[in-house]
């Protein structure tokens, strides 16, 4: 019996073991699951931010452009955002869903520049953690995605 065991053992060593054990496969699957659990939430977060950037930010920027144009044409006037084409709608339909816009035009400066307090904020429906905010600073419009 002992000779049979030694012969079997020797042939196994000579042939070499091929393949993976069940434990090795389970460890690899566990590592992949851990990596996926970390990566998927980050991907979804990035996807929501991209939607706000694509759908809400252009609406806020358009409103700010109207405010700047109004101030260029009407120096010293008080801006009524409801009378501006791109600021008049508080909810705009987009391919990504409804976008809610709120704007503050402030008062135009006497040299035709927009007020530094002028701002437009757009929020995409269904995305609560990011908003598009456009401000007028240093004679230019700056839009950011805040979240």
Question: For each of these PLM feature ranges, what is it?
Answer:
Residues 1-20:
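N-terminal leader/signal peptides at the extreme start of proteins
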Residues 43-60:
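Aliphatic-rich helix starts adjacent to a transmembrane/signal segment
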Residues 15-44, 48:
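N-terminal single-pass transmembrane signal-anchor helix
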Residues 65-147:
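Periplasmic/extracellular, small/polar-rich flexible segments of pilin-like filament-forming proteins
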Residues 32, 60-61:
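Transmembrane alpha-helical core residues of multi-pass small-molecule transporters
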